[in-house]
Amino acid sequence: MFSKSVTLAQYDPDLAAAIAQEDRRQQDHVELIASENYVSCAVMEAQGSQLTNKYAEGYPAKRYYGGCEYVDIVEQLAIDRVKELFGAAYANVQPHSGSQANQAVYASVLKPGDTILGMSLAHGGHLTHGASVNISGKLYNAVTYGLDENEVLDYAEVERLALEHKPKMIVAGASAYALQIDWAKFREIADKVGAYLFVDMAHYAGLVAGGEYPNPVPFCDFVTTTTHKTLRGPRGGVILCRDNTHEKALNSSIFPSLQGGPLMHVIAAKAVAFKEALQPEFKQYAKQVKINAAVMAEELVKRGLRIVSGRTESHVFLVDLQPMKITGKAAEAALGKAHITVNKNAIPNDPEKPFVTSGIRIGSAAMTTRGFNETDARVLSNLVADVLANPEDEANLAKVRGQVTALCDKYPVYGT
């Protein structure tokens, strides 16, 4: 038996204090990590609901447990909404993460040892696209492509490697690539070698939903995404397809192969986020995300910093810190002291170790959710440049921190 009236602060003050401190940090710091965002109060309410109590192995109307009549409604709402959002014929909303969604896609049509062709982690790809340290690189024969000398995705190399290695699956998508990806070109290459085309649009999904980035669904055999990042939902994953060809294989890859019971409270939160993304206001949000990122990149160039690929056409870009004689690790720490949160990130052909790096990754999704516009983005990018110009000057960091505080107070995350 548990108390029905005791609060978290009363029962576990240590944990409550840590949560309160994190809430304060989110309010007082500007979030520029490209994979992070703020969910709405409605999303949090759904995720904190009584649905966390319910086991529901299986799929709507095909459960292995009783009492699922209402969670069936919840999951079907999520399925229908995400299909409408991306123009998909099939959707699985049960993956606990984007990584598990990707694993399920591989497992649905590949066998261990099959060849996959994905973007190199060192050039902006993702761990789950065949990196040697990831299960995708251990189970499958992973071949990687990258960027050309202009730091643009090298489609000629993709085609050459595809013709040479005859992969069973080509993987497109990235975690640190600023430019738009040509899905039609990938489809053309995949068709030349009879490969499945799989796109992981986790970073770009919110922009796709808002009409600010090309939709990969019409071109692909499989599409996955996380539900957080630019899509602004809870942490989780989704699988989408343009038709129902692989429905049975994908469903069984998630359950019972990779997962047991779905997280119904998270699926409810996904449903809320999908409804939010279907609203006209979300299109304006996605547009502003791109504007803010472009403004920041342009301002940083004016301050003498180099942007990988020269510009951004999305929410994200990499800053090459080598001309500044500072590592990504040091830059992340200095910016953190000024209450600007970024992540260190490898740049193409980075001479530094992955935990040090020569770059930082900047994203505009979270700041835009707070209400930052292009004027604020211009101010913020100059504050970033001020820190990078004098990363060890405590007086400089304190000055920037004060200016960041003023910006944050202007745009509270959840307060009024």
Curated annotation (Swiss-Prot):
User: Which reactions fall under this protein's catalytic activity?
Assistant: (6R)-5,10-methylene-5,6,7,8-tetrahydrofolate + glycine + H2O = (6S)-5,6,7,8-tetrahydrofolate + L-serine
Indicate yes or no for the key word Oxidoreductase: no
| SUPFAM superfamilies (UniProt xref) | PLP-dependent transferases (SSF53383)
Please give a single GO biological process term from the UniProt record.
tetrahydrofolate interconversion
Pathway named in the protein's UniProt entry: One-carbon metabolism; tetrahydrofolate interconversion; Amino-acid biosynthesis; glycine biosynthesis; glycine from L-serine: step 1/1
Annotated Pfam families: SHMT
**Residues of the site described as Plays an important role in substrate specificity:** H228
Q: A GO molecular function for this record?
A: pyridoxal phosphate binding
The parts of the chain that form a coiled coil are none
Which residues of the sequence carry a binding annotation for (6S)-5,6,7,8-tetrahydrofolate? L121, G125, H126, L127
**Which superkingdom, per the lineage?**
Bacteria
Kindly state which keywords UniProt assigns to this record, in alphabetical order.
Answer: Amino-acid biosynthesis, Cytoplasm, One-carbon metabolism, Pyridoxal phosphate, Transferase
Q: Which PROSITE patterns match?
A: SHMT (PS00096)
Q: Which InterPro entries match?
A: PyrdxlP-dep_Trfase, PyrdxlP-dep_Trfase_major, PyrdxlP-dep_Trfase_small, Ser_HO-MeTrfase, Ser_HO-MeTrfase-like, Ser_HO-MeTrfase_PLP_BS, SHMT-like_dom
Query: What EC identifiers does the entry list?
Result: 2.1.2.1
N6-(pyridoxal phosphate)lysine carried by residues: K229
Q: Does the keyword Amino-acid biosynthesis apply?
A: yes
Task: Kindly state the subunit structure of this protein.
Answer: Homodimer.
Q: Which family does the entry's similarity section mention?
A: Belongs to the SHMT family.
Role played: Catalyzes the reversible interconversion of serine and glycine with tetrahydrofolate (THF) serving as the one-carbon carrier. This reaction serves as the major source of one-carbon groups required for the biosynthesis of purines, thymidylate, methionine, and other important biomolecules. Also exhibits THF-independent aldolase activity toward beta-hydroxyamino acids, producing glycine and aldehydes, via a retro-aldol mechanism.
NCBIfam families in UniProt: PRK00011.1
Protein name, please?
Serine hydroxymethyltransferase
Origin organism is Neisseria gonorrhoeae (strain ATCC 700825 / FA 1090)
- Gene behind this protein: glyA
